């Protein structure tokens, strides 16, 4: 496991997926099918999340439609068969949406812990999640400022809790920042 962090200094990704893959390989072996199965199972686990997101937005029919679209998506199929972090990233985004939507309605402690956890997981899974979390953070701060101007104390407190939950998730990533900086100076974006 210690070799993963060192190897990633010469790559362009954070380590979470590779740690999960290492644990997976300890149990199921390192054959091609065994290794790809991790992403496949994560993708299958994302189907109910897609259903829940659609249902939350507009009811059961959209939930079924979104799950079907996800199941038939060539992107989901491709990334569900790759030994890369993209399937995990999709699952985290769907889970994060559900948690954020629930927290906007009623910022309960468990939901806020979930937001912190998923925010941290996103950062530890793929660097581009910083853009997503940054956009969510900006929107939350705009919502907070508007609520303060209107004097809506309940919305101010709820939104401040969401911003704090996002920040706590971001703090979990601080130990990896030196590696991120090293990667940015020595590898850039390896796919470019």
Question: How does the language model describe each region?
Answer:
Residues 1-192:
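Terminal, non-globular segments
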């Amino acid at each position: 496991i210690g070799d993963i962090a060192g190897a990633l200094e010469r790559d362009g990704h954070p380590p979470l997926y590779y740690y999960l893959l290492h644990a997976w390989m300890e149990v199921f072996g390192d054959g091609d099918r065994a290794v790809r199965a991790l992403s496949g199972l994560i993708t299958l686990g994302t189907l109910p999340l897609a259903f829940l997101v659609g249902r939350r937005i507009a009811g059961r029919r959209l939930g079924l439609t979104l799950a079907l679209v996800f199941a038939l998506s060539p992107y989901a199929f491709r990334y569900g068969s790759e030994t890369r972090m993209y399937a995990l990233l999709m699952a985290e985004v769907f889970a994060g949406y559900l948690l954020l939507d629930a927290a906007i309605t009623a910022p309960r402690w468990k939901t806020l812990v979930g937001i912190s956890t998923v925010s941290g997981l996103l950062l530890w899974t793929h660097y581009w999640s910083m853009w997503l979390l940054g956009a969510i953070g900006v929107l939350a701060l705009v919502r907070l400022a508007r609520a303060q101007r209107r004097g809506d104390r309940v919305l101010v407190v709820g939104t401040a809790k969401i911003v704090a939950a996002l920040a706590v998730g971001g703090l979990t990533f601080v130990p990896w920042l030196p590696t991120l900086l090293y990667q940015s100076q020595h590898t850039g974006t390896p796919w470019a």
